[in-house]
A protein has these predicted regions:
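Substrate-binding cleft of carbohydrate-active enzyme catalytic domains
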Residues: 300-322
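Generic detector of low-complexity/intrinsically disordered segments
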Residues: 8, 12-14, 206, 231, ...
Length: 322
């Protein structure tokens, strides 16, 4: 993948600032993200075509050296319009070119430790992540993140198309969660998930007749666990949840531990009046960079797996070559 980001000389997005309140508008003016800090708590909303896609949804996290979910003071927004272009093989779109707006907002918690919120806004996508700085006191080299309060609070008329998460170390050879449970289409938000442990990314929502929203994550590396969505809670919506205790046969922690300074993965939100922007989005790639350069030009080849056809109980060579 080759990627370049160029500053645009055009007005590709707009920012409106008030005390404890920032409004970021997409390049085409149809998507609006509002970030505010009231009572020491940060939150955001997302509107599309003047219709609310996400109501006030929480921002922040709780770490071992400080609470960044409350007692916050919001600093200055620093941002600029960008023109994003890159080429990548083996994906739904080989050449991507779009206008975006990128920004950062600094926060201080009650102990005056800092957290930076990164924003990426395009015509149908919003993405955000957190950067944690090294505190001056005790100069820790890493941080344990106990939980994110990152929320997705949908209007009450919203219905869901979600894959339920399942409890760990269950199913075939105790390999679950396998992220392949059956889902109920067009379900009500207030119905608890099938196994009571939330839902698997990506998560699709229908906001009445106003549009669709896809919530997911990208930029996950070995430095941070893959996440899921919690069950729905009235007034708060869904929140980012970490792996369950007991996954991976109990090896490792269910918390995130990252070196300092360090970043979380991106939380992505794709919105559209129809499903077209959901299907066509390239946001999983727009906000990340290649981890390394491929040693060769890899080409697809043939493969086989008898279970896909027969649902057989074992896999052997003779069956695979039939």
């Amino acid at each position: 993948m080759q990627k370049s980001i160029l500053s645009s000389i055009l007005l590709l997005g707009a920012v409106c600032a008030q005390a404890n309140n920032y409004t970021v508008t997409s390049p085409n003016g149809k998507l609006v993200m509002n970030v505010k800090c009231e009572g020491g708590k940060a939150s955001y909303t997302v509107d599309l075509n003047g219709k609310q896609m996400l109501a006030a949804s929480a921002l922040g996290l709780v770490a071992n050296y400080g609470d960044f979910s409350q007692g916050l003071t919001m600093g200055t927004l620093k941002g600029a319009p960008k023109h994003l272009t890159y080429v990548m093989d083996h994906t739904k779109k080989s050449h991507v070119e779009k206008d975006v707006y990128e920004a950062t907002i600094g926060f201080l918690n009650a102990k005056k430790d800092s957290m930076t919120l990164y924003l990426h806004v395009s015509d149908n996508d919003v993405a955000y992540k957190y950067e944690m700085s090294r505190p001056k006191k005790d100069n820790p080299k890493s941080v344990i993140i106990y939980k994110e309060v990152s929320g997705f609070n949908f209007p009450e008329k919203t219905t869901t198309f979600l894959c339920p998460q399942i409890t760990p170390m269950t199913g075939w050879e105790r390999t679950k969660p396998s992220y392949e449970e059956e889902y109920t289409p067009d379900a009500q938000m207030n119905v608890k998930s099938q196994f009571g442990v939330g839902y698997t990314f990506p998560c699709l929502f229908k906001v009445g007749e106003d549009g669709w929203v896809l919530v997911s994550e990208t930029g996950v590396s070995s430095a941070y666990p893959g996440s899921r969505l919690s069950d729905y809670e009235p007034g708060k919506g869904y929140t980012v949840a970490f792996p369950q205790k007991g996954e991976n046969n109990g090896v490792g922690s269910e918390f995130a531990g990252i070196p300092l300074p360090g970043e979380t993965p991106w939380r992505t939100i794709t919105v559209g009046a129809s499903l077209a922007p959901i299907v066509e989005t390239t946001i999983p790639y727009d906000v990340v960079e290649p981890l390394y350069e491929a040693s060769q030009n890899y080409k697809p080849s043939r493969y086989t797996w008898s279970w896909l056809i027969w649902q057989d109980e074992s896999i052997n060579y003779d069956d695979q070559v039939k």
